[in-house]
Amino acid sequence: MSEPLPPRLQEIVDTFVDAPADLRLDVLLDYAKAFPKLPEAYVGRTDLERVEECQSPLFLATELDAEGRVHIVVDAPVEAPTTRGFASILFHGVDGETAETIVALPDDLPTRFGLMELVSPLRLRGFSALLGRVKRQVRELVA
């Protein structure tokens, strides 16, 4: 049995899995359109970590608030809808969760969306790398 996911993230996975295969890319594009706006405090900054494994430029930072909740900051060009879609999924699925919850996310998460036949292995590897970077940054925040 698969490891359980936080409720919002599970809901996103279910949306993909419940959609017919030929509509899953449309769902991914919907998430790309819902890509979070870069917070004003990050505009022009150059200290976001680049996720090199992504085919398109993707930059990442994580923050821990006073209540111990993690906030994810991502930036990617509008011309990179797949990359933006994957980053948006993580943002909408886990932003505001505890560090413990995020670090416990399963490494196989990118395979749970039913996209294996629809996007290239390189794109899925980028999603895996993004997840790995988020988890590593969060571990560093709480160390």
Language-model features, listed with the residues they occupy:
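Conserved interaction-surface patches within small, structured recognition/assembly domains
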Residues: 63-81, 91-95
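C-terminal binding/interaction regions
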Residues: 100, 105, 109-143
